[in-house]
A protein has these predicted regions:
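Active-site neighborhoods and metal-handling regions in enzymes and metal-associated proteins
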Residues: 20-447
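Positively charged n-region of N-terminal signal peptides that target proteins for export
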Residues: 1-5
Length: 447
């Protein structure tokens, strides 16, 4: 399977010259193909594996639903239809029946198109035992059903069918995390563009001249030229694009100074996909010809730890089981667990306890990515001590995630213990963990 993916990526990443090529049309056709493949290949298992007969996804007119690009159709600004029902029913066979009520099927994906007032008739004719709807206590993208829409739904269905309602969070989770080949190829393509832009941007730093925003805006322009924007939904779209002096020198007068260790955490969004990676650079001091020995030692051992982690993550385990296996493997290799169960000061406190010893501490945050950058918003298993609500989820084949871990070490030249947060994006297959783009193997040196 991965052999064919590799071949697809070769063609995808190679320069292609097409007369009068239209990028907008290309993006539309890619999204359409992914949606079709997900409906045909992923949706049946997402319902059947969770013992769901019917999935009703409720969308209010004028509100952007988290699954809008996954499901397609037109639901916005339809004053005559204040609510839209996407209805997916398992009626046997090799496909799931697809119905849209109160919206418009623009691409021919749905078998039946009608009014939202037809809901009860549709449900009665199919008489499902279990009806999953988009309400959830813990998963934001599966909780788009507002209170008023729930009341409207319950009134339309009546007590008989309302009593059969369950959360669709498991259906939505499986529908999202089970990937089709074109989805993975698109993600890898976007990720590689981002990686090249970030690394090129860091190499442009002029000590004492370049400010973080100079580098950030340049990178933003390069990405936007290819139609790629940020995936973090921040108040300022500029926020994800700014690198900063991580250690030990602050940016005097707002520019990068010599001796600065720079960290850059960025996520980009495109084609209903979101990335999340980090890159590091070091600005040599006037009398330096290479990275300080203490920092290089920490980095090299972090790369060794990466291999231990990479060999521990397998398909078929739950996130919780995987986290336990990671702790055992890392501690067996001589690393000290310095976790944070509450995402506050616990990690820093444990790190300080190691002081100036030669020991290396670590904590992991192997969170899902793929459709969004941040694990808190993404579906799927999360391997992190503070993400226990996702610990029961099983790592499935083609699981895309942020290969992220914090690694701390004493740096003699700086007289302090420093934490380095490694992060690249990867996929788990039956072969193990595979990176979707070249990793941050070396610190970028700025002279």
């Amino acid at each position: 399977m991965m052999k064919y993916l590799a071949i697809a990526l070769m063609f995808l990443l190679a320069p292609v010259i097409v007369a009068d090529a239209q990028e907008s049309q290309q993006n539309y056709e890619i999204m359409k193909l992914i949606r079709q493949e997900k409906f045909d290949l992923i949706l049946p298992g997402a319902l059947r594996d969770n013992n769901v007969d019917m999935w009703i996804h409720v969308v209010e007119s004028g509100r952007m639903d988290p699954l809008a690009l996954d499901l397609g159709g037109w639901t916005e600004y339809r004053a005559w239809e204040p609510v839209c029902y996407y209805i997916f029913t398992d009626r046997g066979g090799d496909r799931i029946e697809r119905i849209i009520l109160g919206g418009e099927d623009l691409d021919g994906f749905y078998d039946i198109e009608g009014s939202s007032h037809d809901l009860l008739q549709i449900v009665e004719e199919r008489n499902p035992d279990v009806i999953a709807v988009n309400m959830s206590e813990s998963l934001g993208i599966a909780n788009g059903l507002s209170h008023t829409s729930y009341l409207r739904l319950a009134k339309a269905l009546g007590t008989r069918f309302t009593e059969r309602l369950v959360s669709a969070e498991n259906v939505i989770t499986d529908f999202r995390v089970r990937r089709v080949q074109r989805e993975v190829a698109a993600f890898a393509h976007i990720l590689e563009i981002q990686r090249q832009v970030m690394e090129a941007a860091l190499k442009r730093i002029e000590p004492g001249v370049s400010a973080p925003e100079d580098i950030g805006w340049w990178a933003a322009d390069q990405l936007l030229a290819q139609g790629i924007g940020p995936s973090y939904q921040a108040a300022s779209l500029f926020l994800p694009y700014m690198p900063f002096s991580y250690m030990p020198v602050e940016s005097a007068d707002g520019v990068f100074q010599r001796g600065a260790f720079i960290m850059w955490d960025m996520g980009v969004g495109h084609l209903n996909l979101g990335t999340d990676i980090k890159r590091y650079a070091y600005v040599l001091k006037e009398n330096e010809t290479k990275i300080p020995a203490g920092l290089q030692r920490a980095w090299d051992n972090g790369q060794k730890a990466r291999e231990v982690l990479k060999n521990t993550i397998k398909v078929g385990r739950t996130a919780g089981e995987t986290h336990d296996a990671i702790l055992a493997a890392m501690e067996s290799a001589g690393y000290v667990s310095t976790p944070s169960d509450d995402r506050t000061s616990q990690y820093r406190d444990l790190m300080k306890e190691l002081g100036d010893s030669d020991k290396f501490g670590f904590s992991v945050d192997m969170h899902t990515t793929g459709n969004t950058s941040v694990g808190d918003a993404a579906t799927g298993p999360q391997m992190a001590p503070w993400r226990s609500d996702r610990a029961h989820l099983v790592i499935q084949p083609m699981h895309i995630f942020a290969f992220e871990f914090e690694f701390n070490a004493w740096i003699p030249e700086w007289n302090k213990r420093v934490s380095i947060n490694f992060e690249d994006n990867a996929i788990v297959t039956h072969n193990g963990v595979e990176y979707l783009s070249p990793i941050n193997e070396d610190i970028i040196v700025v002279r």
